[in-house]
Amino acid sequence: MTNIRKTHPLMKIINSSFIDLPAPSNISSWWNFGSLLGICLVIQILTGLFLAMHYTSDTVTAFSSVTHICRDVNYGWLIRYLHANGASMFFICLFLHVGRGLYYGSYMFMETWNIGVLLLFAVMATAFMGYVLPWGQMSFWGATVITNLLSAIPYIGSDLVQWIWGGFSVDKATLTRFFAFHFILPFVIAALAGVHLLFLHETGSNNPSGLSSDADKIPFHPYYTIKDILGALILILVLTCLVLFSPDLLGDPDNYTPANPLNTPPHIKPEWYFLFAYAILRSIPNKLGGVLALVLSILILAFIPLLHTSKQRSMMFRPFSQCLFWVLVADLLTLTWIGGQPVEHPFIIIGQLASILYFLLLLVIMPITSLFENNLLKW
């Protein structure tokens, strides 16, 4: 008799995705982040669901409802901090996952990569709206500043901003709709992740060498299930340590002050995972130019497959490209640091140089270096 997992309509989908899936025998721990992102999403949906049971999306009671969750709800503080720090873990995994894709040429799977870029935008939008919900000072002013950027769009800009606000400023209507979108988007993300996997399984996984691994495949279970469990345990350990020992390490103290439209905080800045994009936005003196640079800083990922000039897929055997990749990583860390600094000398010029270098590396230097490497190998 054939095993039920191979015949049952539902079971065979799971079987072909997580059990009998042929996987390359040489994929490293950098391939763990897909499953870790899935775990992060499940953690965020579950903790978010329990938070939504006690949260009220009204400007008068939003801040005190979060206080109520932390003080009066059984383990409410734990749920709240798991959710807040879970977002940080989500973005750490996301950045590492995207970095892995860039390094090993996984972007050559065009459909998978483009859905991944779409997922990145969706997660960033969700995180931004979630940050507004506690209705602290940084929530309110962050929402005001970022939504106001849309007014830079010619002709329709100011109407668009008022349409998003649901009034003439960030107020009750804005908070209510942000809560609604923040609740629904994770389910859209889950559906998109399913499509992401669907396209990945059409081609099979890439591997560190960037060469075809069709001749050497192993079943996903038990080899990679056990490997993913190890990754999951490390993720949960780090998240638990963060939540239990220093839950506010990555947060902003200003968000413990209730939102006050009459009092602007001295330094308005987003959560740490948006700082690199915020630094790029601030490095351009023109408003519309800044908004375009902000969008392009992420959208540029969609053009990476078109900029691939190397005859090799992975950077594993390309030392010059490897050096440039790590320069790009250092540049992004510099931008993250600058995004959290006040707008004054010397931070302005450092931010501008780092922003120029970011776009130059991806659009010009790396493609030219790839051509140079082809030439070295007489390809």
UniProtKB/Swiss-Prot annotation:
The chain crosses the membrane at residues 33-53, 77-98, 113-133, 178-198, 226-246, 288-308, 320-340, 347-367. The keyword Iron applies. It is found in: Mitochondrion inner membrane. Its main location: mitochondrion. GO terms for molecular function: metal ion binding; ubiquinol-cytochrome-c reductase activity. Heme b b566 binds at residues 97, 196. Its cofactor is heme b. A ubiquinone binds at residue 201. GO terms for biological process: mitochondrial electron transport, ubiquinol to cytochrome c. InterPro entries: Cyt_b/b6_C, Cyt_b/b6_C_sf, Cyt_b/b6_N, Cytb/b6-like_sf, Cytochrome_b, Cytochrome_b_C_euk/bac, Cytochrome_b_N_euk/bac, Di-haem_cyt_TM. Component of the ubiquinol-cytochrome c reductase complex (complex III or cytochrome b-c1 complex) that is part of the mitochondrial respiratory chain. The b-c1 complex mediates electron transfer from ubiquinol to cytochrome c. Contributes to the generation of a proton gradient across the mitochondrial membrane that is then used for ATP synthesis. Belongs to the cytochrome b family. This is Cytochrome b. It comes from Blarina brevicauda. The gene is MT-CYB.
